[in-house]
Structure formats: structure tokens, C-alpha cells
Amino acid sequence: MFDHTSVLQFLEKRFGVREPNVSAWRRAVCGDLTSAFNFVDPNHEPLPTLQTTTRQAADSLRQRQEKLLPVPVPSTSKQLVPQQKRLARPSRALPYRLHVDSQVDHKARTLSLSLQNTGTQGAVLHVYDGLHLGDIPRRYTLEAGKALQDSWTVVERYQLWVLGPNGFHRSFHGQMQQRQPELLVTSSQHQLQLTLSNPGGQAATVSIDRCPYTQQGPWTLSIPAGGEVRQVFPCESSGGWYDLTLHSDGGWLRRVAGRLETGEHSISDPLMGRP
């Protein structure tokens, strides 16, 4: 993430002069803009073609525009929602490596989330309680290399929604009345691995919806009582982007979405603007 202090941090990086007015929090969370450039030497990347014009043509266009009548305010009954262009753009590799895992304690009737940042840049995570949207969401700043944990008291059901940078998304739905599957998400290069465990006394079935980015799936997995299964999802064809929703009995749901960072340059969200 970049903000107004990112320009100052870029100048610090370039000239070695430290700006004392940039807070420690902004240094942890906001980048210094160096990732927006490619400093590889030699750099043989072709420069993008820009539309050319002349000073005379630009002045002529400005003069014609100044003679136009003001654009009338459109009627509220005729206004349309702007359309988002559905086009992926080149995207630099990002420094984020975020992990969020859940653990249900039936005896204490709590749901705990473990938040971990194994990347090189701090990040802010927002956690919304879908069953109590009137409550202020909990917000956490995770420094690079740090981890923390927090818990929610659950009466019967829970529904938490975690949001982070660059489309990072985790959803946790379930109930306390019965033991339900548990999910652990790990990654290796261009693959995402889901490990599903079943702490219950009976076999459990988990359905995984089709991934809209790669069109893989759907799948149905059977987990024996006290056992676990693993499912691997290649993400290279989608530039690292993934969106997987898992369902089981009793309203159990987990959703994991975002972009898998490998240190390589990729593309922006290819499904941006689509419902």
C-alpha cells in the first residue's frame, strides 16, 4: 500500500536523508514506491507506446473545449452505474505473505483466528462479524514477520469475514453444536494446498466450488473421522489469483481468495468488474 509518505520514503531511499515526521506505523505498512519500478540492469523491457500530439493540436483542443456549454447535471432517473473495464494489467510482485487460520474451542465456545505475516511488508487486516454488522470491525496491523491471535465468543453460530490488501479474503462460517471440519491453507511456489481435518466422530463431506479464475473443480472430498485430506490447486495459469469456497453440513463454510505471491511479477485481478 502507498500513501503520501511513500513519496518521502522514496526520496529517503534515493538520497539517504531520513524524514523524521514519518511514523513507525506508516513505515511498517506503506511502501516506498521502489516496487513500482524495474531497476534490473540491463533492462530490455520495451517502453509502452504513448499517444503523440503537438503543442498546436493541444492548444486547439483546449480552445474548442472552452467554447463548449457546461455539461448539464443528468436526471437521477437516467444515471447509470459506471462500467469497470474487464482487463488485466501487468502487476509488480508484492511483498505480502498473509495467513489466517481458525480454531474452534467447543468447551470454551470461542472461535480463534491466528493471523500471521511472513512477508517483508506490514499489512492491515479488517475482521467483520457478519452476524453483528452493527459492531465496529476489528482491525489489526501485522508487521513483517509477526503474528497475533484473537478470539470471539460464540453462542451458537459464527460468521467472520477477513479482508486484507490486494484482494486477500477469508471467510469463516459454522456452528458450535457439532464438531465440523478444520482448514489449513499453505502455499508453495505456484500451488495452493488445502489441508482439511475432521475432528468429529463420523466421516465428513466437504464440497469445493469451481474456481472462477482457473475453472478447476468442483470437487467433493470425504474426510474420515479423525483423519485429514489434502487438495492442491495450481494457480500459475491465473497469475496466482484464486477464489475457493468450501461447504459442509451444518452451515460450515470457508472461503479463501486472493493472489498467491511468489516473488515474480504477475497481473492485476483478471475478474475485476465482474459480478
Language model region names:
Residues M1-P275:
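Membrane-interface soluble catalytic domains
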